Every structure is written in structure tokens, then in C-alpha cells.
From Swiss-Prot:
This is 3-methyl-2-oxobutanoate hydroxymethyltransferase. Its EC number is 2.1.2.11. Keywords: Cytoplasm, Magnesium, Metal-binding, Pantothenate biosynthesis, Transferase. Homodecamer; pentamer of dimers. It catalyses: 3-methyl-2-oxobutanoate + (6R)-5,10-methylene-5,6,7,8-tetrahydrofolate + H2O = 2-dehydropantoate + (6S)-5,6,7,8-tetrahydrofolate. It holds the Pfam family Pantoate_transf. The active site is at residue 214. Disulfide bonds: none annotated. The gene is panB.
Length: 296
């Protein structure tokens, strides 16, 4: 090939997705707004300003949600289900979650990234919790951690906060305890509501900056929200919480089968992706792809 045959297209900018073979993101864009922090959570509570949280498990999705100004991204142990294909959240490990945390942090320069402490990484007590949480901040780049349980994890929360690690608690339906609570059902009814409130207050006293309330009666969640100085994050807990969180595949309609009652689908991504994949398969089969415009 002589010089006249050499392509003359300008080299793409290093931050341009086209600069990589598969259109994957390279370095995140320079932040134009500051990263959301624990102080912002407290300020929003004081102003009565609601905020949103979504799960994320990879850099590309994290970048999309960061662009949409979702302030908090949770690398949840729900990755056990939606990434690794486990039936419950119980099997996932710290080592399986850490690469996902790193990816989300790289993709989201503005969001607070929260890492779930998986089952078996903190139940042994404060020392185990501190070792696990430290890995997520030091090796993963997370900005906070989340753990399930009330009074039984208060000592662990106190140790984490004392070490400078921001903590979100999680009450109500706690999926890591699914074998104990006997299934996915509403928690906190009747006298159990008083126990949940006491647990929430105990987490607040231990230094947690927020608490997730999952699948609890809306009136109970509203009461807890009013009683606490820290933020409440609802998932199946009504509109009275300070914030809301959803698994992004549920929110975007990518999950298959029935979704929980509390999920609102904002798109039908499963159908869109399936249709796109079928169209691609048909084009390849019938010789319609690639064409000259897709060739060098």
C-alpha cells in the first residue's frame, strides 16, 4: 500500500470512546460538579430535599447514571443475582464485589459510591467488619459501605465510623438473612415496627449517616424518617423516606419475570436489547452487515 492509500482520518482524542477498539470508556471526563458526599446527604435531610440512589456494577452503566446526575451509586450484593447469576445474595464474596466497585468508581466521577458488605464479611464482629470495609475503601475506592442488621451490628458500625469509614445501615427485609426471615415478605408490622425503630435509632447513635428501609409499611417508614436525624433510603417503603433506591435492572425493565410491587419500570430495556440482538443476528446471517460503511 502506498502513501495515497493511507487513511488520513485524524487520530481520536484519548478520552473519545472511539479511541478504544470496542467503544468502551477510557478516562472519565473532568468533573464539572463536585462529588456528592456525606455532608450533602445531611444537608438534603435538613432542607427536606429528596435524592435518589441506583445500583451499578460496571463503568459504562455508572457513567450513564453519573451523567444523569444520580448522586449515589450502590455496588450492591444484589450483584450476586444480576451479575453472577446466584439465586440469593448469600454466596457473593468481597473478592467478587471488589472489581465491580473499582469499575463503578472509575466510571462515576461525581457520584458517591457505596459498597455493600457481603454476607460473611462482617458478622464475625467489629474486627472482621473493619477489615472488609477497609478493603472496599482502600482497594476499591468506595466512599462508604452498607451493611445489614440492627442492634447486632451496632458495635461493628461504631468501629467503622471510629476508623473514618462512612456507613449506611439496612433494616426491614434484609436479603442476607433470607433463610432466617423465611422469604421475601413485608417486615416491621405490629410490634416488630417498634423493634425496627429502636434499631434505626441505635444505628444513628453508632454513627451511621443513613439507613435503608426495605419492604416495610409506608407509615412505619415515615415515622422512622421523622424520628431520625440521619437520612432514610426507601425501597418498598413508601414515599415518606428521604431518598429512594432501586436495582437498576428493575428500574430500566431489564430484569426478567415478575418484579416486586415497589418497582416502577422507567423503560423496557429487555425488549429493546432483545430486538437489537435479533436484528443484528439477522443482518449477519443475511449478509446485510457489515456493509462498506462499516469497513476500512
Amino acid at each position: 500500500m502506498d502513501a495515497s492509500d493511507t487513511p488520513t482520518h485524524p487520530a481520536p482524542h484519548p478520552a473519545d470512546p472511539a479511541a478504544t477498539p470496542y467503544g468502551a470508556p477510557t478516562t472519565p471526563p473532568r468533573p464539572l460538579r463536585s462529588r456528592f458526599t456525606v455532608r450533602d446527604v445531611a444537608a438534603a435531610k435538613n432542607r427536606g430535599e429528596k435524592w435518589s440512589m441506583l445500583t451499578a456494577y460496571d463503568a459504562t452503566t455508572a457513567a450513564v447514571f453519573d451523567e444523569a446526575e444520580i448522586p449515589v451509586l450502590l455496588v450492591g450484593d444484589s450483584a450476586a443475582n444480576v451479575v453472577y447469576g446466584y439465586d440469593t445474595t448469600v454466596p457473593i464474596t468481597v473478592d467478587e464485589l471488589l472489581p465491580l466497585v473499582r469499575a463503578v468508581v472509575r466510571g462515576a466521577p461525581h457520584a458517591m459510591v457505596v459498597a455493600d458488605l457481603p454476607f460473611g464479611s462482617y458478622q464475625g464482629g467489629p474486627a472482621e467488619a473493619l477489615a472488609s470495609a477497609t478493603r472496599f475503601l482502600k482497594e476499591g475506592g468506595a466512599h462508604a459501605v452498607k451493611l445489614e442488621g440492627g442492634s447486632r451490628v451496632v458495635r461493628a458500625v461504631d468501629a467503622l465510623v471510629g476508623a473514618g469509614i462512612p456507613v449506611i445501615g439496612h433494616l426491614g427485609l434484609t436479603p442476607q438473612s433470607i433463610h432466617t426471615i423465611g422469604g421475601y415478605r413485608v417486615q416491621g408490622r405490629d410490634e416488630a415496627g417498634e423493634i425496627l425503630l429502636a434499631d434505626a435509632l441505635a444505628l444513628e447513635a453508632a454513627g451511621a449517616f443513613a439507613v435503608v428501609l426495605e419492604v416495610v409499611p409506608a407509615d412505619l417508614a415515615t415515622r422512622v424518617t421523622k424520628e431520625l436525624r440521619i437520612a432514610t433510603v426507601g425501597i418498598g417503603a413508601g414515599s415518606g423516606c428521604d431518598a429512594q433506591v432501586l436495582v437498576w435492572q428493575d428500574m430500566a425493565g431489564l430484569s426478567g419475570g415478575r418484579t416486586p410491587r415497589f418497582v416502577k419500570r422507567y423503560a423496557d430495556l429487555r425488549t429493546i436489547l432483545a430486538d437489537a440482538a435479533r436484528a443484528y443476528r439477522a443482518d449477519v446471517r443475511d449478509g446485510r452487515y457489515p456493509t462498506i460503511e462499516h469497513s476500512y
